[in-house]
Amino acid sequence: MYAIIKTGGKQVKVEVGQAIYVEKLNVEAGEKVVFDEVILVGGESTKVGAPTVAGATVEGTVEKHGKQKKVVTFQYKPKKHSHRKQGHRQPYTKVMIEAINA
């Protein structure tokens, strides 16, 4: 059984026992998290929501928080001795999926 959930402005396909990386959630490591915005539940029979599947939830446990690899942006203006270098590390949350309730 699998499901497609919406979290952090993105859609993610999940299965039980899978670890996913999502945008940072305001939940401590080790706590349970429930995703209510389930767009599709698949398996023997597929349920498609309009826009979400009524009563369907996905449960998981937060394993850790962290930051992704640095993305470097560099801008310059030729012949003007003007340049700017900037780095960014996006925070994420690692979630282990435990149950899909449909």
Curated annotation (Swiss-Prot):
Keyword Chaperone recorded: no
Domain of life: Bacteria
GO MF assignments: rRNA binding; structural constituent of ribosome
Entry GO terms, CC: cytoplasm; ribonucleoprotein complex; ribosome
GO BP, one annotated term: translation
Stretch forming the signal peptide: none
Stated name of the protein: Large ribosomal subunit protein bL21
Species for this entry: Enterococcus faecalis (strain ATCC 700802 / V583)
